Regions:
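Surface-exposed loop/turn segments and immediately adjacent short secondary-structure elements
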Residues: 1-117, 122, 126-130, 147
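Hydrophobic (often cysteine-bearing) scaffold residues that line and stabilize catalytic clefts
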Residues: 9, 13, 62, 66, ...
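Short helix-interrupting loop/turn segments at helix-coil junctions
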Residues: 19-28, 57-62, 79, 91-97, ...
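Short, conserved micro-motifs composed of acidic
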Residues: 34, 232, 318-341
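Inter-domain linker/hinge segments that demarcate the starts of reverse transcriptase
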Residues: 44-53, 80-88, 134-138, 163-175, ...
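Conserved catalytic palm subdomain of right-hand nucleotidyl-transferase polymerases, strongest
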Residues: 57-65, 103, 113-123, 161-202, ...
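Conserved polymerase palm-domain catalytic core
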Residues: 188-288, 295-304, 324-328
Length: 341
């Protein structure tokens, strides 16, 4: 491969990834910057806990510091990191190296010539993960307060097996009582990459996340930079204008809150929706962005799906119509959404 072709490949990857994360024109910045209540300082014992939970033998990026170094330095590492974390906590400003990510594209099955047919793994600074772990622990208490039982994504003692078991049980009971049931398996197109930042800050405010934590999250997302590492070298650095950070442990928490806001606005918290089980109406099961809608009639299922679609688009999330599927125990007609069947 000649130099010109290699440079063209890098340029194409940069254009594709930069376009994917380009800030939307309908996502204006409306933050007033006021912080009234400060969260308690970070304790050294919490820092030791965060260091102890880190996974070893992982590739390092950004500052180039491997996780194993913290094990070697022990208390010396705790003192230095505690000073850095405290400074971030009080000033709400993150080191720029901690806001940089390296994308490595991995081809999926099928045609490997199209950039959209790749998934990416992302390398971020190991040092930043210590502060992120502490911030995640602070966020989790608020997340557990806001999220319903039907959301099992990235939550302690819950998982996909629980949701699969729930679906099997619902189907068995529907057969036992000879009731029709309609499932809609929703698939979003690049859900984590499309979230509007300022929409996210508004949602965090509405669910009463402390301003201090929201400011830390906002400043982490603002000014993000990324590069794509290809087989022909790395691209220039470019700005990330939307979506949550890939490879960041905070991203699933933030997406769950974002998705919960959408589902509430779609009316999924209404008592009359869904199917009735043990005096309770169940209308959806979720694992992060993977959502199943449930109804006892086809018309109600269509209506619920259109509400979710409409509210999702208000939040810059688009349904992948091609990958959204319907499963029914009774008769069903052909559905068309946006001209697609």
């Amino acid at each position: 491969m000649d130099l010109t072709e290699a440079e063209d490949m890098k340029k194409r990857w940069q254009e594709y990834t930069e376009g994917l994360y380009e800030k939307g024109l309908n996502d204006p910045d409306n933050h007033d910057g006021a912080i009234i209540h400060l969260e308690p300082d970070i304790l050294e014992c919490k820092l030791k806990w965060a260091l102890g939970s880190m996974t070893m033998n992982k590739a390092s990026e950004g500052d180039g510091i491997p996780a194993e170094l913290f094990q070697i330095l022990k208390d010396d590492a705790v003192k230095v990191l505690h000073s850095i974390c405290q400074q971030i906590w009080k000033t709400h400003q993150w080191p720029q190296d901690w806001k940089r990510s390296v994308f490595i594209p991995i081809p999926k099955k099928g045609n490997a010539k199209g950039s959209s047919n790749y998934c990416t793994i992302v390398l971020i600074s190991h040092t930043s993960k210590v502060t992120l772990k502490i911030l995640q622990a602070r966020l989790r208490q608020y997340m557990n307060r806001e999220l319903p039982d039907v959301q099992a994504g990235f939550r302690k003692s819950r998982g996909t097996r629980d949701q699969i078991a729930n679906i099997r049980w619902i189907i068995e009971k529907a057969r036992e009582f000879q009731k029709n049931i309609y499932f809609c398996f929703i698939d979003y197109a690049k859900a984590f990459d499309c979230m509007g930042h300022n929409k996210l800050w508004k949602i965090l405010q509405e669910v009463r996340i402390p301003d201090h934590l929201t400011c830390l999250l906002r400043n982490l997302q603002t000014g993000q930079e990324a590069t794509v590492r290809t087989g022909h070298g790395t691209t220039d650095w470019f700005q990330i204008g939307k979506g949550v950070r890939q490879g960041c442990i905070l991203s699933p928490c933030l997406f769950n809150l974002y998705a919960e806001y959408i589902m509430r606005n779609a009316g999924l918290d209404e008592a009359q929706a869904g199917i009735k089980i043990a005096r309770r109406n169940i209308h959806n099961l979720r694992y992060s962005d993977d959502t199943i809608l449930m109804e006892e009639s086809e018309e109600e299922q269509k209506s619920l799906l259109m509400k979710v679609k409409e509210e999702s688009e208000k939040g810059a999330l688009k349904l992948s119509i091609q990958n959204t599927k319907i499963m029914a125990s009774g008769s069903i007609t052909s559905w068309q959404i946006d001209g697609k069947q």
